[in-house]
Amino acid sequence: MTELRYLDFDYSEDTEGHGTFDAMASTAPARTHEVLAEIAQVLAWADATFPDARGALDDGATWDFDLQQTREAPELDTVTFSLSGTPDFCAALRAHFGLD
């Protein structure tokens, strides 16, 4: 199991069974690279575990993500990360990263 320091996910599910994990992290700009590195680790796992499966879930893909980064103030960056997937993808993500 891989431990995440910055990403604390909330989970929701749509009527078709697709799940979405949403996380937001606000840090000093000097630490933003650590948040982005953690996101890169999650995305690398997703791509390695479900290769060539990223895309719009409505079009039959297995997983997709959205990433936004904003500077809220000179001393605060906020990163929002959403990761969506099929039930199999969500189960594997939970198991690998120990998510509830």
Q: Residue locations for each model-derived region?
A:
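Mixed-charge, glycine-accented linear interaction segment located at domain edges/termini
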Residues: 86, 90-100
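Generic preference for hydrophobic/aromatic residues in regular secondary structure cores
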Residues: 7-12, 23, 63-68, 72-74, ...
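Long, contiguous N-terminal structural blocks used for assembly/anchoring
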Residues: 1-52, 58-60
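Amphipathic protein-protein interaction modules
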Residues: 37-87
